[in-house]
């Protein structure tokens, strides 16, 4: 069942304790001719671009590193996902004893913080950790604080924040059309584009409202 939560962190501004210099393709040993679509740098902004091949990398993997997302407006946060990036770890197969320890905090003013996710005493390997917040909070700023990672580098491809904003809900699109193709299993679906939209939800099925 759809909770109504939306991705609040997409393309939002990010600042960090540090970031590594250089470019990812060079660091990974790729040349101009064979490098994949990946991060050209290790900047904090890579955390909110929803691109799994880009990532932020701190200068160290220690417990003084952090990143902070500005949601640009207050919102109620219900879940957070941390997707770590396996950058030059040279770790293969199932290795016992790996663990990720961190905390995620939220704040309305950037000064007073509350804990959203507490993984300080976590002793499990959680490279793509999705956590529903026990006590959803109304915040504007979301901060990840690193404690321990099992890899040589602290690299994160996405820090995703889910919840409900306080803006106006989007309306139904206009001029929605469905045109069946020769093979009736196929159809062309069109509608008028909506300015500044991030995406569209299309409901389909046999019910009249789908």
Placement of each model-derived feature along the sequence:
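Aromatic, loop-rich ligand-recognition surfaces of beta-strand-rich domains
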Residues: 1-12, 18-21, 37, 42-117, ...
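Conserved, compact domain cores that house catalytic/ligand-binding motifs in diverse enzymes
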Residues: 202-208
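Short, tryptophan-glycine- and acidic/Ser/Thr-enriched carbohydrate-recognition patches
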Residues: 21-32
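Surface loop/turn signatures of beta-propeller and other carbohydrate-active proteins
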Residues: 122
